[in-house]
């Protein structure tokens, strides 16, 4: 006979193993204070809940790590594909040539099929093949050359004097020299012939600017070195090198800069609110051109004179195609 069935109804809940959880049956204990609620509350297993929360937290962390790894892989793939595309574009622009025909405007665009195979284990950034628009710099025949020779306006050169220098002594004893260490950590010295300016640093390095030719720049640098020698320093003349050449010219006609920047977006930028000239970055030779609507052109970034001449002969037919006809 079942023990629970022999007990009164009000005591069956107490005798059952789940008596503490049986609703409707009040529980009384002499140890309970007077007025304590008699309705039992279910006992929660906090250990199982904490384990579930920890598992969910670990899963979320793993998902975040996987997402970060995927983003890093995508960024690396994009960088690799951009590098491959840039190298291919540079190679194609260096190999392009045009055949000029009389009575026709120079060709300004060239559509070339570019196939970029994805690297092993990567996904292609764009479908292959693609047909990017790359500007052409048409070669002008000798009979149709521009006839304009850019004039050199400034040459920047550097030289190493091979010894440490006391700039205060140089500024006090040399003529046409100024030194303000709070403003600039070099002595600024000037001479009249050739009219140039030198920046002399305490390490012995010197920068010479303002010369109009390579010979003038070398001559001016030697004169500055001689001045330092006369002040008692064991100065030498080492590692003379031309760092930058700036030239300018005028094509004698106005230019539509808006059309030029739309045609050559890869190589040019034009923000008239910030700077009135169009900035054109030529790849070969590596020259930066400042083109103004009036027809004035400034070329900078050359190491030798021939690079300035070559860059202008490349850009002249393009400027001719964007000549204003009003």
From Swiss-Prot:
One of its GO terms (cellular component) is male germ cell nucleus. Residues 1-21, 114-146 are annotated as: Disordered. InterPro entries: TBP, TBP_CS, TBP_dom_sf, TBP_eukaryotic. PROSITE patterns: TFIID (PS00351). It holds the Pfam family TBP. One of its GO terms (molecular function) is aryl hydrocarbon receptor binding. One of its GO terms (biological process) is transcription by RNA polymerase III. Its main location: nucleus. Sequence repeats lie at residues 152-228, 242-319. Residues 114-125 have a biased composition (Low complexity). Keywords: DNA-binding, Nucleus, Repeat, Transcription. DNA binds at residues 154, 190, 205, 244, 281. It is found in: Nucleus. Belongs to the TBP family. Binds DNA as monomer. Belongs to the TFIID complex together with the TBP-associated factors (TAFs). Part of a TFIID-containing RNA polymerase II pre-initiation complex that is composed of TBP and at least GTF2A1, GTF2A2, GTF2E1, GTF2E2, GTF2F1, GTF2H2, GTF2H3, GTF2H4, GTF2H5, GTF2B, TCEA1, ERCC2, ERCC3, TAF1, TAF2, TAF3, TAF4, TAF5, TAF6, TAF7, TAF8, TAF9, TAF10, TAF11, TAF12 and TAF13. Component of the transcription factor SL1/TIF-IB complex, composed of TBP and at least TAF1A, TAF1B, TAF1C and TAF1D. Association of TBP to form either TFIID or SL1/TIF-IB appears to be mutually exclusive. General transcription factor that functions at the core of the DNA-binding multiprotein factor TFIID. Binding of TFIID to the TATA box is the initial transcriptional step of the pre-initiation complex (PIC), playing a role in the activation of eukaryotic genes transcribed by RNA polymerase II. Component of a BRF2-containing transcription factor complex that regulates transcription mediated by RNA polymerase III. Component of the transcription factor SL1/TIF-IB complex, which is involved in the assembly of the PIC (pre-initiation complex) during RNA polymerase I-dependent transcription. This is TATA-box-binding protein. It comes from Macaca fascicularis (Crab-eating macaque).
């Amino acid at each position: 006979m079942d023990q629970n069935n022999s007990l009164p109804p009000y005591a069956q809940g107490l005798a059952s193993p789940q008596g503490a959880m049986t609703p409707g049956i009040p529980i009384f204990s002499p140890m309970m204070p007077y007025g304590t609620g008699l309705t039992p509350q279910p006992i929660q297993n906090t250990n199982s809940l904490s384990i579930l929360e920890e598992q969910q937290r670990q899963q979320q962390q793993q998902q975040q790590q996987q997402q970060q790894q995927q983003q890093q892989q995508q960024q690396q793939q994009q960088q690799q594909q951009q590098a491959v595309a840039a190298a291919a574009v540079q190679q194609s622009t260096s190999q392009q040539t045009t055949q000029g025909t009389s009575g026709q405007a120079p060709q300004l665009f060239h559509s070339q099929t570019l196939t970029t195979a994805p690297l092993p284990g990567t996904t292609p950034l764009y479908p292959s093949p693609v047909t990017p628009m790359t500007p052409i710099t048409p070669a002008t025949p000798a009979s149709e050359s521009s006839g304009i020779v850019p004039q050199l306006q400034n040459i920047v050169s550097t030289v190493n004097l091979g010894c440490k220098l006391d700039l205060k002594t140089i500024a006090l004893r040399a003529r046409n020299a100024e030194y303000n260490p709070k403003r600039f950590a070099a002595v600024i010295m000037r001479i009249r012939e050739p009219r140039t300016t030198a920046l002399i640093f305490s390490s012995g390095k010197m920068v010479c600017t303002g010369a109009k030719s390579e010979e003038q720049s070398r001559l001016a640098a030697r004169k500055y070195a001689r001045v330092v020698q006369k002040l008692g320093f064991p100065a030498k003349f080492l590692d003379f090198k031309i760092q930058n050449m700036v030239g300018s010219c005028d094509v004698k006609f106005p230019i539509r800069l808006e059309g030029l920047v739309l045609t050559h977006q890869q190589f040019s930028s034009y923000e008239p609110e910030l700077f009135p000239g169009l900035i054109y970055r030529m790849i070969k030779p590596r020259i930066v051109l400042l083109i103004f609507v009036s027809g004035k052109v400034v070329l900078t970034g050359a190491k030798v004179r021939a690079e300035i001449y070559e860059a202008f002969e490349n850009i002249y037919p393009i400027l001719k195609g964007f000549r204003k006809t009003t």
